[in-house]
């Protein structure tokens, strides 16, 4: 109970949570509108996109019932985002960079929000980082499953999870500094804002300059001899012809 009171009395923490909820809800609602869903489906998709990551975090923290279902303010904020998207959809859909910026902003805000809440519940730094990433990425994962698409964190080759992880790690360091009396509350607010700015900048720069994470190493010239000669029946490989199988 004392922990919940501490969270609810932190105006900056509450502001981050509400702003992240609205931004993330706008992105989720737009995805549902593009799929041609009805208003109820838009509301559900927006709500789960905005608060799904936080629900996962709260369940893992044991903070029950989760804020995503118990906090009327957060639920209303998510639903307002859905209504806003449904009304101004044609205009919003044309603003590619604006929506990308909103998504990046939600990513940074939720990274700070989720990690800070985990640290307030006296989780270890590693656990707080994972819970922060669950908060930042969980809603998007749920959104993409609802609209039957490969999750953005998987299909987007630009930096997406990486900025979130960086933001979570930096937030842990700030929280540890606060706990040890090294960082004051005003300094914590400034540092949290800078962390959000860094996450947003990393995300947008990676998209603008097409910076991608490397994949598997190409090994086109490597030949592995077939082991079909040791089998009673030959195995036909889809990328080899019969001469490859007979080769010793």
Residues covered by each model-derived region:
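Short, structured motif recognition centered on aromatic/hydrophobic residues
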Residues: 44-48, 55-61, 130, 134, ...
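Ordered, amphipathic secondary-structure segments that act as subunit-interaction surfaces
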Residues: 80-117
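Cytoplasmic-side transmembrane-helix entry/capping segments in multi-pass membrane proteins
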Residues: 40-48, 70-76, 96-107, 131, ...
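Structural signature of hydrophobic alpha-helical transmembrane segments
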Residues: 9-21, 66-80, 124-137
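Hydrophobic alpha-helical transmembrane segments in multi-pass integral membrane proteins
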Residues: 58, 112-123, 166-181
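The first (N-terminal) embedded transmembrane alpha-helix
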Residues: 14-27, 45-48, 167-170
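Short, highly charged, low-complexity non-transmembrane loops/tails of multi-pass membrane proteins
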Residues: 214-244
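C-terminal ends of transmembrane helices
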Residues: 25-35, 58, 83-96, 141-152, ...
């Amino acid at each position: 109970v004392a922990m919940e009171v501490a969270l609810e009395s932190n105006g900056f923490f509450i502001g981050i949570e509400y702003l992240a909820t609205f931004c993330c809800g706008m992105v989720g609602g737009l995805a549902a509108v593009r799929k041609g869903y009805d208003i109820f489906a838009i509301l559900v998709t927006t709500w789960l996109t905005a608060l799904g990551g936080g629900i996962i975090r709260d369940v893992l923290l044991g903070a029950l019932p989760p804020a995503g279902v118990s906090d009327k303010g957060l639920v209303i904020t998510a639903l307002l985002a859905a209504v806003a998207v449904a009304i101004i959809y044609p205009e919003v859909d044309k603003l590619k960079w604006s929506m990308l910026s909103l998504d990046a902003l939600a990513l940074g805000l939720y990274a700070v929000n989720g990690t800070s809440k985990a640290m307030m519940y006296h989780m270890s730094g590693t656990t707080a980082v994972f819970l922060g990433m669950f908060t930042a990425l969980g809603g998007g994962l749920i959104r993409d499953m609802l609209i039957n698409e490969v999750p953005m964190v998987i299909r987007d080759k630009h930096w997406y999870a990486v900025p979130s992880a960086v933001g979570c790690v930096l937030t842990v360091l700030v929280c540890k500094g606060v706990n040890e009396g090294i960082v004051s509350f005003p300094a914590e607010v400034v540092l949290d804002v800078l962390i959000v700015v860094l996450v947003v900048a990393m995300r947008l720069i990676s998209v603008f300059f097409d910076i991608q994470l490397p994949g598997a190493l190409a090994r086109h010239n490597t030949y592995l001899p077939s082991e079909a000669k040791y089998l009673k029946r030959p195995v036909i490989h889809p990328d080899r012809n019969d001469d490859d199988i007979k080769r010793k």
